[in-house]
Amino acid sequence: MRGIKALSIAFGIIVIVISCNNPFSTKYNVKGEIVAFPKSEAVNNKNSLEWWYLTGALRDSLNNRYGVEYVFFHFHTKDHVSRVMVNVAITDENDSVFYYDYLIKKRKNYLGGPLAPEDFNSYINENEKIEVELGSKLPINFQLQDYSWKGDQGYYTITAKMKKNSAGFNLTTTPTKPVVLHGNSGYVNYGGITTAGYYSYPRLKTKGTITLNDKEIPVEGIMWYDRQWNCGEITKKDITWDWTAISLDNQSDLMLYRIQSKKNDGYLFGGTYIDSSGNTMKLNHDDIKLIANNNWKSPDTKKSYPLNWEIEIPKLEIKLTMSPIMPNQELEIKSFFGSVIYWEGLCDVKGEMNGKPVKGESYLEMTNK
């Protein structure tokens, strides 16, 4: 592959399409060599771009299915301002409705702790706040208007209330597999673009309620958690990618990506396989075959996204097909730095592994810059 160093890591990110020059400052990116828990769960001060990400499939007592996406972004820009953005979405399969909302706010620059006790005490009394708790544990503890996320290391409580829809949720998660440190240490080199921190908790057991049209619905299922930082440089306009996290009914999980620079021909593939016990296998470019087709054109943005995906991993004897449960799961976010457009939604997966039939669910991210 010309012009891009091989990425022998798992690559999974929330997709940001920016219609202007890269606004992020990388001056304060973390110069780490290994992830340390629980500290790595907390905010990094003035980071170029970092996020905390949950997606998954939940069901109610009637087996109706719902997709949930929840992301907190924190970023520091070249105008020396730290900001926070939250993205939230719910896919209602039964009624074929996709709900989403977002919020962007300026934040104080001392987000990355630990804070002095006097700063901490005054800060948490604000009406709108993001906070980092003091002490030996630095759990996630964010609150931004009607959105909150608390906990650490797979034990999370998340709440959301959308402004423009009578929709939201109140969910708690519990880990069922060990943390996955991508790049072995939890730091990865994205093709020479940046060295980013990256780890995941796959298959989080999830329970709680979803609210649709002011009605609370008890649900349960599994979700996938991603944590990344130092990612400002990967939002450049000439870089595109697609990503998926797949959970199969044999209790194994896959994370796969394809990345492309507009300056180069073809795609670069990578990912991670996680077996039923939580053991991981790094998947390199030559290990993966991904073919996408049958484009769907958004009636809102006029962008096109492939709806049918064929996945092959010969070394694991895996052959899968993946398709969304409904076409329109696109988000369009208007921010101070331009238009943020991406497709992210719940998909069905079926195929075979080691000659045996498997099926499952996935979340898929797609860009089309």
Model regions: which residues?
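Bacterial N-terminal signal peptides
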Residues: 8-17
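Bacterial N-terminal signal peptides that target proteins for export
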Residues: 1-8
